[in-house]
Each structure stands twice: as structure tokens, then as C-alpha cells.
Amino acid sequence: MLVYLVRHGIADRRASTDQERGLASEGIAQNQSVVKKLYLQSPLIEKGFVSPFERAKQTAIDICLTFPDIEFEETALIIPDADPYDVLNLLEENQDQNVVLVSHNPVLSDLVSLLADGTIKSNRQIGPSNVLRMMMDIVAHGYGQLKYILEP
């Protein structure tokens, strides 16, 4: 299974709630840059999951403009403070497909630590508009291999 972890770009600080915060103009430019780099990697992506937060949905739209065959499903399992073990279960349920997750920190950083190192305590960090490609033969903590990181 291939898993692409995508953190949204830099978000605007002005909004009524955290969920409503959209991308700043710099975040939009970052997303466009990293999606172009992802396209050059010819990824095999069959399904997408996106956080219901506005900035993640905007990032998923940027991905869809380049990869129109990817259908995204909105899920609260990947909101910023979600439990990475719940995300691991989501991946296990979809292990017959290569997926992209468009989400936030800290859940993405915790997830990459869990998949690659077997613990969320390893303190890996994912920057804005970064894309990580992970490969897993078995969907379980500690079995993920980080193949590459794309930055804007």
C-alpha cells in the first residue's frame, strides 16, 4: 500500500473558528508548487481522504485540479487533534488501495512517527504543503517506509 500524506499550506490567521480558516495566498502558492512536483512523480492514487477543515479542503481541490480521477471523502478522523491510531484503522480498512490523506499537524506528524517508528513519541514534523510518500506491506505501526518528501 502507498500512502501520500499531505499537509495543507500556510493558513490565514483570520477566521471565526479554526475549522473555517482558509489558506493564505502564500499557502495557495505553496500547494500549487508541491502538487506540480507530485505530478512529476507519477503517483498511483486511487482514493483520497480530507479533513473537514477549510484549508484542507482547499488543498484537496488543488490536488483534484491536477489529478481529476481522485475522489475525496471528507472525514473527521484526520482533523488536527485526531488520534493517529484511528487513522491507522482507516488505512487498514482501505489497504487494498493507494490513498492520499490531506490533513494537518499534529495528527500527520504523529501518524508518520507511528507508521515509520512504531511510536508517536519520535517527534517527526511535517511542514506546510509537504507531501510524504510512505509504503507499507503491512498496515501496522512501525511498518511504514518513508520513500520521499516533497516540499514547495
Regions found by a protein language model. Name each.
Residues 2-78, 82, 108-109, 122, ...:
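Active-site-proximal alpha-helix that buttresses catalytic centers in soluble enzyme cores
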Residues 41-44, 93-97:
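Glycine-rich phosphate-binding loop signature in dinucleotide/nucleotide-binding domains
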Residues 73, 113-118:
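Short Pro/Gly-enriched beta-strand edge/turn motifs at strand-loop
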Residues 105-115:
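Extended, charge-rich low-complexity interaction segments
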Residues 119-145:
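Domain-level recognition of soluble alpha/beta enzyme cores
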Residues 147-152:
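Short, solvent-exposed aromatic-acidic interface loops
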